[in-house]
């Protein structure tokens, strides 16, 4: 019998193998076609009597290509392994998650044998490779629900001692860690083994030990199970299982561990019990288990660590991190030590493997399981294609994309068809040599069928793609058309609205002026007697009419200017009218009434002229009626102005007007004189007016002068007015002068006025002078007034001399400078008018002081350098010289005299002073470049962003300024002297007054700052120290969406911390930035106690964008609360009105616990802030620093923040804003480089975000801050961990010593 040769046998076996491969490929092709058609019967025929591996192979294909009904059918009918791995080591659950098929993921998770904790080749669980956040959340939610339900059922069975149910649950817990026998219960603080041991249940203890309970697991109180029993049998049982576990070769290696270990502290204390946790490759320890959620004492990233274990000491091991971090740990037993050593070693090895480059499977092969990486890559590229878009871009109102699911499905089918086609072609090439082989025809048939199917699939895909493109194109065109129409209409509407408002205001102003003119004319005509009555003759002419309708001479621009200058200039007024405007009009604004003159020099002028007998009752009645009418007009005018946020217009008469009045006739009666003075709150007249007034007739009666003075709050006259008044005749009667003085609260006269008053005649009676002085609260006279008073004739009575007492200067005394470098305080006390001062002393004091002051131009109390925090008391009736800070100030505030720092404060100051290394260089005050950014239309870019969040806008770098939002937070620290001033003040109301001034001063730097600062990167930090003021500051970007920056600053006297969290939106006409975070201030006052203040910032807005003149406004209410005493302060930042009314204005009050006002606050946040007690004097709390022109409208303090000196650089972390390349490039004027660097940093940040979402990087957590609840207010806030300054000191010393230093756990973000 002949035996076949070995060659023939091998040839036959090879041929059979090829036929088998061909048959498998054909069956796979048939299976694909059945999956695509959804033919369940065909699938059943193909998988009938197939092995478990073949059915599992079909399951892998169906997950990628079949519908969910087909997958459920395979899972329920055929014997498959749902936890099997494919060629690329992916489970079916991994493939379903990578394909983004949530329906199939749900079907797999409901399978009883599924193990969702398995990891793939990249050491990732199934939920970590999900392509969408929704699918990832779904899978996580399922895990949590399953774990909770299983754990709840097991606890219930444990309490009931149902060992059968416990066995069933533990068997199903083999794959999923839903049950942890060593878990410490939150309520009892003990494990299952502790509870069973305390209950002396030996059977239950044995069951727990058999199923893996650890007898050396400590409870919340640090005790072992053996500590809860004295039964020797129970102790022996626990020890025996300990011995068995000790002798076991390979203890289980858990991924997460926690428990008590003894940690070496120092030679004095030795080992101390600490709670350790191992989670996500990080080993951390805490003082006890209760602190595990909040107070971490230290941690080591095992990626950078190594483990040291000496076999001679089986319970001791060391974990050594990078640098000097080293944990020397001692376990309770060798078993516990081995368990921890194995877990730590496994974590270190996993990190090392994760850092190795991935070696993919054979790329040349076209096995079925190679589809998963390709499909995952395709799906991932689709998912990451929109990574540059913000989250809010996905909520466009649209219908579902046509056939989206079918599109992805056909893509997978096409890939599998190509794979099968390659196999068939390869088989055909191998069988070409056998011409007569019938399999050749089968091969070509298969190729034909495959090509036909592939062609059909490609056509379907292209058709679906065309539909999608058509859909998106139509959607985009509609959006563009709507956006263009909206932008055009919005701009038109805004412009039309502005024009309508302007026309309305002009019409309303004209109506009011006309109404007042006719009212005055009607009142004058009503009182006009008949020609036969010689007691009062009133003549009207063109001059009277022109003067009657005076208001029409004012333009809107002039009216607005006067409104702004007078009504809202809180420090430009006197007599407690800080927020009111004095009615001020020129002499030609009303009817002029003159008295008859006994001098023949004066010639008549066109005016309202009368000839009257002032002694008659009718004349007096007419005078009273006219005075009443005029006062009514003034009151109505002032009310209207106030209601419209305006003020009464005032305008100084020109020289021509003065010259016209110089030659007024002398035959003018008392009524005319009364009417002129009554309705003319005069300002400083010019030379012509003074010259005209000098020639007034002397026969003015008493009543006329009295009325004139009652209604004329005069301002400072100029030289011409003084000269005119010097030649007043002496025949004025007592009554006239009395009436005049009652109505004229005069201000400081100038040199001309003083010279005029020196030559007043001596015939003035005592009564006139006394009444005049009663009604004229005068200010400090200037040099001219002093000269006039020195030459007063001796016939003046004592009452007349009393008028000079109000002109005496105010004594100024130096305030006490605080121990901290706070600025000098200046105060000028306002002295009330006194009617009983000694005339001689008052006059002499006025002369002596005015001689000195006459050399200086009278101006407001000047503030010295650093006077922004000074408590300056400004008198409404006084002016100080520029060097007034050298004089002493009489302060009503309660100051501590040179407060001595206690021991605790000194210690705090020393701790903070350590952080001042690197800040030895002088402060930078300017930039070397100019603001020559490329000019781009702001509206052209922003018009498509209306209604969106500003923080998610991507603007060109030319719209930025070379600062960061973190540095904007640091700009709040410019006026910290206010906090030092508050700290040294003993009065609680004055303390909160200075705190309020500090809160308002934070907005001073926002003026004209319309450019957008750079958005901080996640993890970016900024530090700033001020050695002269003794504080240090640190801020970190702890969140990116929404953007949140956590800040912390401290000095020896205070701690200031909070979060910069805003909600911003663009409304088309304006940007609105609304702060959300609360700011906390812990202030140490002179008694040593600490007070807590809190407040939230007000809304900032950039307006005027469409009109091309953007400006910054801050508005809203700020509530400052002292939680220690209950005192509060409310600041109201007035919004900018139409045409600039109320611009920058701040008003508020300090209230006691029973809501009683104690102090009033007013001023402007861009200039000065004042405080004033009710019915008391006001003090200057804060004044803005000088702001010279700088590039990008930056303040000198803001310019100093980004300075990077060689002394400072070694001390900074790699995340500091000063090291940011795009911001530095823009500061240097390299705008193209800044744009490219900005784009690079943003792409790098997006890439890290995607890696964190996919599980390739650990989740983000802030490095220097942690979220917590405030212990006093209960609000959420960011708690500083106090590690930054310690590590900074280590880094600086290492760099100065020439050593390398890596900041621990700090990301590379630049």
From Swiss-Prot:
Residue numbers of Phosphoserine PTMs: 384, 394
PH domain ranges (all copies): 254-349
Annotated Gene Ontology cellular component terms: cytoplasm; cytosol; nuclear envelope; perinuclear endoplasmic reticulum; plasma membrane
Polar residues biased stretches: 607-622, 713-734, 837-847, 865-875
Region: Disordered, residue numbers: 1-20, 526-561, 574-904, 1228-1258
GO molecular function per UniProt: 1-phosphatidylinositol binding; oxysterol binding; sterol binding; sterol transfer activity
GO biological process, one term: sterol transport
Domain of life: Eukaryota
CDD domains documented for this protein: PH_Osh1p_Osh2p_yeast (cd13292)
Ranges of compositional bias, category Basic and acidic residues: 528-542, 591-604, 703-712, 735-744, 767-776, 824-833, 848-859, 876-889, 1235-1245
Annotated Low complexity bias: 1-14, 785-808
Name under which the protein is recorded: Oxysterol-binding protein homolog C2F12.05c
């Amino acid at each position: 019998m002949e035996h076949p040769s070995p060659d023939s046998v091998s040839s036959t076996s090879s041929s059979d193998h090829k036929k088998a491969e061909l048959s498998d490929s054909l069956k796979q092709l048939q299976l694909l076609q059945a999956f695509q058609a959804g033919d369940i019967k065909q699938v059943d025929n193909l998988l009938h009597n197939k092995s478990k591996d073949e059915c599992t192979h079909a399951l892998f294909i169906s997950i990628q290509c079949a519908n969910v009904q087909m997958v459920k059918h395979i899972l329920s009918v055929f014997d498959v392994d749902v936890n099997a791995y494919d060629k690329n080591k992916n489970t079916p659950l991994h493939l379903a998650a990578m394909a983004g098929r949530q329906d199939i993921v749900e079907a797999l998770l409901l399978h009883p044998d599924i193990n969702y904790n398995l990891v793939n080749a990249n050491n990732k669980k199934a939920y970590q490779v999900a392509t969408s956040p929704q699918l990832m959340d779904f899978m996580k939610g399922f895990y949590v629900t399953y774990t909770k339900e299983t754990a709840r059922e097991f606890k219930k069975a444990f309490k009931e001692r149902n060992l059968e149910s416990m066995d069933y649950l533990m068997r199903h817990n083999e794959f999923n860690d839903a049950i942890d026998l060593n878990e410490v219960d939150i309520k009892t603080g003990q494990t299952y083994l502790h509870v069973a041991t305390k209950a002396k249940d030996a059977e239950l203890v044995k069951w727990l030990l058999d199923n893996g309970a650890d007898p050396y697991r400590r409870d919340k109180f640090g005790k072992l199970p053996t500590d809860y029993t004295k039964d020797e049998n129970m102790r022996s049982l626990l020890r025996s299982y300990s011995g068995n576990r000790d002798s076991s070769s390979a203890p289980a290696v858990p991924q997460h561990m926690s428990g008590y270990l003894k940690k070496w502290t120092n030679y004095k204390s030795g080992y101390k019990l600490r709670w350790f946790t191992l989670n996500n490759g990080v080993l951390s320890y805490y003082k006890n288990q209760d602190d595990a959620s909040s107070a971490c004492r230290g941690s080591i990233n095992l990626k950078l660590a190594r483990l040291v274990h000496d076999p001679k000491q089986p319970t001791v091991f060391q974990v050594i991190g990078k640098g000097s971090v080293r944990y020397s740990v001692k376990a309770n037993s060798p078993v516990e030590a081995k368990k921890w050593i194995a877990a730590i070693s496994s974590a270190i090895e996993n990190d090392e493997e994760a850092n190795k480059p991935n070696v993919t499977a054979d790329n040349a092969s076209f096995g079925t399981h190679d589809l998963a990486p390709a499909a995952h890559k395709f799906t991932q590229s689709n998912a990451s294609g929109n990574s540059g878009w913000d989250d809010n871009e996905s909520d466009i109102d649209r219908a579902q994309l046509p056939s989206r699911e079918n599109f992805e499905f056909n893509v997978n089918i096409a890939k599998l068809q190509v794979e099968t086609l390659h196999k068939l072609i390869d088989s055909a090439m191998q069988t070409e040599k056998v011409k007569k082989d019938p399999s050749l025809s089968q091969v070509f048939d298969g190729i034909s069928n495959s090509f036909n199917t592939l062609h059909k699939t490609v056509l379907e895909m292209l058709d679906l793609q065309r539909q999608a493109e058509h859909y998106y194109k139509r959607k985009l065109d509609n959006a563009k058309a709507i956006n263009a129409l909206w932008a055009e209409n919005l701009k038109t509407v805004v412009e039309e609205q502005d024009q309508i408002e302007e026309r309305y205001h002009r019409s309303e102003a004209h109506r009011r002026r006309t109404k007042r003119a006719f009212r005055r004319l009607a009142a004058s005509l009503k009182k006009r007697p008949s020609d036969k009555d010689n007691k009062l003759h009133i003549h009207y002419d063109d001059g009277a009419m022109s003067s009657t309708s005076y208001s029409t001479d004012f333009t809107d621009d002039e009216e607005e200017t006067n409104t702004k200058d007078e009504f809202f200039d809180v420090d430009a007024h006197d007599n407690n009218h800080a927020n009111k405007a004095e009615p001020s009009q020129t002499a030609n604004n009303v009817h002029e009434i003159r008295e008859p003159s006994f001098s023949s020099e004066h010639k008549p002028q066109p005016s309202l002229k009368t000839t009257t007998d002032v002694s008659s009752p009718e004349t007096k009645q007419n005078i009273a009626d006219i005075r009443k009418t005029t006062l009514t007009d003034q009151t109505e005018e002032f009310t209207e102005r106030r209601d419209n946020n305006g003020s009464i217009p005032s305008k100084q008469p020109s020289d021509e007007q003065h010259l016209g009045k110089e030659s007024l006739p002398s035959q003018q009666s008392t009524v005319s004189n009364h009417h002129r003075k009554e309705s003319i709150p005069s300002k400083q007249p010019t030379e012509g007016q003074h010259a005209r007034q000098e020639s007034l007739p002397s026969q003015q009666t008493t009543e006329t002068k009295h009325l004139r003075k009652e209604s004329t709050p005069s301002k400072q006259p100029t030289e011409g007015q003084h000269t005119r008044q010097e030649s007043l005749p002496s025949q004025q009667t007592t009554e006239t002068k009395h009436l005049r003085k009652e109505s004229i609260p005069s201000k400081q006269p100038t040199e001309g006025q003083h010279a005029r008053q020196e030559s007043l005649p001596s015939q003035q009676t005592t009564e006139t002078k006394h009444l005049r002085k009663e009604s004229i609260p005068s200010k400090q006279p200037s040099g001219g007034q002093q000269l006039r008073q020195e030459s007063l004739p001796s016939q003046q009575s004592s009452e007349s001399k009393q008028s000079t007492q109000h002109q005496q200067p105010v004594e100024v005394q130096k305030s006490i400078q605080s121990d901290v470098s706070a600025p000098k305080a200046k105060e000028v006390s306002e002295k009330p008018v006194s009617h009983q001062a000694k005339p001689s002393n008052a006059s002499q004091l006025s002369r002596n002081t005015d001689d000195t002051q006459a050399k200086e131009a009278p101006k407001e109390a000047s503030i010295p350098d650093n006077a922004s925090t000074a408590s300056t008391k400004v008198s409404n009736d006084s002016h100080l010289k520029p060097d007034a800070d050298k004089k002493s100030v009489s302060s009503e505030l309660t100051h501590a005299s040179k407060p001595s720092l206690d021991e605790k404060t000194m210690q705090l100051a020393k701790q903070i002073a350590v952080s001042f290394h690197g800040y030895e260089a002088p402060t930078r005050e300017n930039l070397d470049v100019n603001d020559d950014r490329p000019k781009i239309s702001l509206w052209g870019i922003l018009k498509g962003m209306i209604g969106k969040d500003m923080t998610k806008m991507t603007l060109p770098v030319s719209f930025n300024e070379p600062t960061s939002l973190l540095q904007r937070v640091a700009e709040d620290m410019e006026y910290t002297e206010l906090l030092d001033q508050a700290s040294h003040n003993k009065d609680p109301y004055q303390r909160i007054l200075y705190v309020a001034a500090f809160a308002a001063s934070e907005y001073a730097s926002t003026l004209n700052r319309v450019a957008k600062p750079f958005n901080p990167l996640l993890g970016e930090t900024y530090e700033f120290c001020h050695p002269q003021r003794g504080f240090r500051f640190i801020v970190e970007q702890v969140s990116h969406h929404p953007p949140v920056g956590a800040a912390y600053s401290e000095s020896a006297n205070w701690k200031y911390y909070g979060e910069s969290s805003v909600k911003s939106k663009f409304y088309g006409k304006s940007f609105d930035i609304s702060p959300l975070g609360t700011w906390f201030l812990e202030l140490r006052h002179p008694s040593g106690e600490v007070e807590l203040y809190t407040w939230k910032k007000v809304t900032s807005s950039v307006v005027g964008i469409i009109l091309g003149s953007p400006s910054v406004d801050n508005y809203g209410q700020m509530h400052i609360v002292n939680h220690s005493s209950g005192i509060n302060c409310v600041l109201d930042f007035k919004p900018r009105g139409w045409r600039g009314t109320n611009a920058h204005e701040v008003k508020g009050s300090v209230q006691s616990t029973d809501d009683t006002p104690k102090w009033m606050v007013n001023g402007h946040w861009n200039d000065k802030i004042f405080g004033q007690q009710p019915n008391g004097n006001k003090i200057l709390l804060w004044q803005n620093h000088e702001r010279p022109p700088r590039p990008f409208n930056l303040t000198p303090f803001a310019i100093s923040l980004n300075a990077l000196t060689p002394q400072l650089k070694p001390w900074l972390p790699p995340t500091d804003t000063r090291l940011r390349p795009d911001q530095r490039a823009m500061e240097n004027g390299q705008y193209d480089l800044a744009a490219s660097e900005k784009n690079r940093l943003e792409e790098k940040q997006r890439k890290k975000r995607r890696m964190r979402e996919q599980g390739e990087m650990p989740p983000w957590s802030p490095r220097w801050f942690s979220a917590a609840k405030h212990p006093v207010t209960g609000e959420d806030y960011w708690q500083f961990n106090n590690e930054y300054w310690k590590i900074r000191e280590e880094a600086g010393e290492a760099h100065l010593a020439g050593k390398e230093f890596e900041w621990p756990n700090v990301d590379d973000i630049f």
